Design a protein with these regions (language model features):
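Positively charged n-region of N-terminal signal peptides that target proteins for export
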Residues: 1-4, 19
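Sec-dependent N-terminal signal peptides
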Residues: 3-13
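Sec/Tat signal peptide C-region and signal peptidase I cleavage site
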Residues: 14-18
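Solvent-exposed loop/turn segments connecting transmembrane beta-strands
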Residues: 23-36, 60-67, 84, 145-154
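Gram-negative (and chloroplast) outer-membrane scaffold detector with strong preference
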Residues: 40-137
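Outer-membrane beta-barrel "beta-signal"
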Residues: 153-165
Length: 165
């Protein structure tokens, strides 16, 4: 009987305080032809950590695209309000990115591959519906630290839709 009560209390506490989110960046998918998936886990009501993975599907010759072909971004968010539906947050992130950068050598244009790591910050806002629907938008920038072949700045822009469970 004690085990049953313990299991029921654990299940009810998990449902009462949803701590996990899965999201898809719809702006990237529609505008830039890339897929960015994110997972976020709450440490407290005011802080969370997560990871997002960006896969660029646009061709290298496309004028409007991210420089990065692939980017994995672990992040930490601090929420400045404890409102249950609308939250404003600040984010620190580390972006591990790789792609191709266009260069000119001896009057020839070529693409040079790179892999680099960026540190950056972002700000944003999140809406949480009572049923678990999540909509968040954020904007930020990071700076690549290690490679001389990589772009200096890395954008962090998104409009996500997802589910809290």
């Amino acid at each position: 009987m004690k085990k049953l009560l313990l299991i029921l209390s654990l299940i009810s506490s998990t449902v009462a305080y949803s701590q996990h989110e899965i999201k898809l960046d719809i702006a990237d998918a529609l505008v830039i032809r890339s897929i960015e998936l994110s997972y976020e886990s709450y440490l407290t009501e005011e802080s969370s950590f997560g990871i997002s993975a960006l896969f660029n599907l646009a061709k290298q010759e496309t004028n409007f695209r991210y420089n990065e072909n692939v980017m994995f971004t672990p992040y930490y968010r601090h929420y400045f309000s404890t409102n249950k539906q609308w939250n404003f947050f600040g984010e620190g992130f580390v972006g591990i990115n790789s792609g191709k950068k266009e260069g000119i050598k001896n009057s020839n244009i070529y693409n040079e591959k790179y892999t680099d790591g960026a540190l950056g910050v972002a700000v944003g806002s999140k809406y949480i519906a009572t049923g678990g629907l999540i909509i968040d938008a954020y904007v930020g920038v990071g700076r690549n630290l290690f490679g001389s072949n990589s772009p200096l700045l890395v954008p962090r822009v998104g409009c996500n839709i997802g589910w809290r469970f």
